[in-house]
From Swiss-Prot:
Gene name for this UniProt entry: trmFO
Function: Catalyzes the folate-dependent formation of 5-methyl-uridine at position 54 (M-5-U54) in all tRNAs.
EC assignment: 2.1.1.74
Annotated GO biological process: tRNA methylation; tRNA wobble uridine modification
Species name: Brucella abortus (strain 2308)
Cellular component GO terms held in the UniProt record: cytosol
Annotated protein name in UniProt: Methylenetetrahydrofolate--tRNA-(uracil-5-)-methyltransferase TrmFO
């Protein structure tokens, strides 16, 4: 690390996981940083301490398996990149089987101590109530899901009021190769061709009356998660949880997101479905499909059991389950460029959960990328995005362009927060053992190993450019 004290500092707003990691990466590159954190001057309903990188929910960073789990691959890539968050997590690990879990107090204290001790990092405890003044120059905004209202309003004013969401409405996402296409079929309603569409842009899952009634009953009876007190109840038109719609009457769903009109079962064209669940392509690769209109507060265990009742989804593998939470985040695919800069004001860069990633590790990873991109620019170097074959690149791609933006559901935005998962990675050729054809679970594991090996090799090559 060489110090460039003659450089003007980079300002980072928000001392959570992403902001802490961004500040560390910038300082480690030799560029001075001012890290602004509003706690303890102003607290939140979720934070309990004034430590940086406080973990407000679980103490788990999820699987540490870097061979067959996408988040484990992201762990490995972050370690290769010199991540502060991963170093402190490893130093404060507690037993959790194959997962990386941490002593939450020890972890956040360690992050705080490392940042406070760094000669190029200045920590300012103050609330930033608006967008940074132009004289600050390059600034990273990493204010997280609980962004203070005044700053959120300023961001909304800069980006357009519709560009900032205050609650996520997450519908489950399914891996395409787990959908039974002997039951389901491709068709848009009334064969309508939308922008960039073919008239066959949805996968349709048909139900007869008996299946529909059993499904509605299961939705109503399923275990549900209550809102936390500070979240309020953010139901609004176009974003009702699927189980709340079911409770409004037995016919509500089949006249709403499950309406069968304009659809003909390609496998049985003479029999009209009583109801239809539609799945819409979620990423440009075509590896992921989301369940249209299926945002939910059902507990995860209930979701998997109930949604596998849907014909064609009996063996569905979920890349993400549904939810509805308090969460401030940008419509990033529209607003941010491929190195996380605001297109309309390129001195502003965003990082962490406010960009639309989901999870501790993912937020930290986007902070790491934002920090590296910013440091490169300050040092008059090129900010080179990671390859899409890496976990870094797959996650960045979802945020800045891999997600397909649609406008066909009034009251909803199609871009929703996402954890890293193998469905975000470009497909890979799976090596076949000589004279043997892989099937089932064996094939799935081989595919994951191939994706992981490619990701780590490509990540090492990318890091060698910096």
């Amino acid at each position: 690390m060489s110090n460039n004290t003659d450089l003007s500092p980079v300002h980072v707003i928000g001392g959570g996981l992403a902001g802490s990691e961004a500040a560390w990466q910038i300082a480690q590159a030799g560029v001075p940083v001012v890290l602004h954190e509003m706690r303890p001057v102003r607290g939140t309903d979720a934070h309990k301490t004034e430590q940086l990188a406080e973990l407000v929910c679980s103490n788990s960073f999820r699987s540490d398996d870097a061979e067959t789990n996408a988040v484990g691959v992201l762990h490995a890539e972050m370690r290769l990149a010199g991540s502060l968050i991963m170093a402190c997590a490893d130093a404060h690990q507690v037993p959790a089987g194959g997962a990386l879990a941490v002593d939450r107090e020890g972890f956040s204290q360690a992050v705080t101590a490392r940042l406070e001790a760094h000669p190029l990092i200045t920590i300012e405890r103050e609330e930033i109530t608006g967008l940074p003044p132009t004289e600050w120059g390059t600034t990273i905004i990493a204010t997280g899901p609980l962004t203070a209202p005044s700053l959120a309003e300023a961001i909304a004013a800069e980006t357009d009021a519709d560009a900032l969401a205050f609650f996520d409405a997450i519908a489950p996402i399914i891996h395409f190769d787990s959908i039974n296409m002997d039951v389901c079929w491709f068709q848009s309603r009334y064969d309508k061709v939308g922008p960039g569409g073919t008239g066959k842009d949805y996968i349709n899952c048909p139900m007869d009356k008996e299946q529909y009634e059993a499904f509605v009953a299961a939705l109503i009876e399923g275990d549900k998660t209550d809102f936390k007190e500070w979240e309020g109840t953010p139901y609004f038109d176009g974003c009702l949880p699927i189980e709340v719609m079911a409770e409004r009457g037995p016919e509500t769903l089949r006249h709403g997101p499950m309406k069968p009109m304009g659809l003909t079962n390609a496998h049985n064209p003479t029999v009209k479905p009583y109801a239809v669940v539609q799945l819409r392509q979620d990423n440009a690769l075509g590896t992921l499909y989301n369940m249209v209109g299926f945002q939910t507060k059902l507990k995860y265990g209930s979701q998997t059991g109930i949604f596998k009742m849907i014909p064609g989804l009996e063996n569905a593998e979920f890349a993400r389950l549904g939810g509805l939470h308090r969460n401030t985040y940008l419509n990033s695919p529209v607003l941010l460029d491929n190195v996380l800069r605001l297109k309309s004001r390129q001195t502003l860069r965003f990082a962490g959960q406010v960009t639309g990633c989901e999870g501790y590790v993912e937020s930290s990873a986007i902070g790491l990328l934002a920090g590296r991109f910013t440091a490169a620019e300050k040092l008059s170097q090129a900010a080179v995005p990671p390859p899409p074959t890496t976990a870094f690149g797959a996650l960045l791609g979802h945020i800045t362009g891999g997600h397909i933006v649609t406008n066909d559901e009034p009251g909803k935005r199609s871009f929703q927060p996402m954890n890293v998962n193998f469905g975000l990675f470009p497909p890979v050729d799976v090596p076949k053992p000589e004279g043997k054809r892989l099937r089932g679970k064996e094939k799935t594991i081989a595919k994951k190993r191939a994706l992981s090996a490619r990701a780590l090799a490509d990540c090492r090559n990318w890091l060698s450019l910096y």
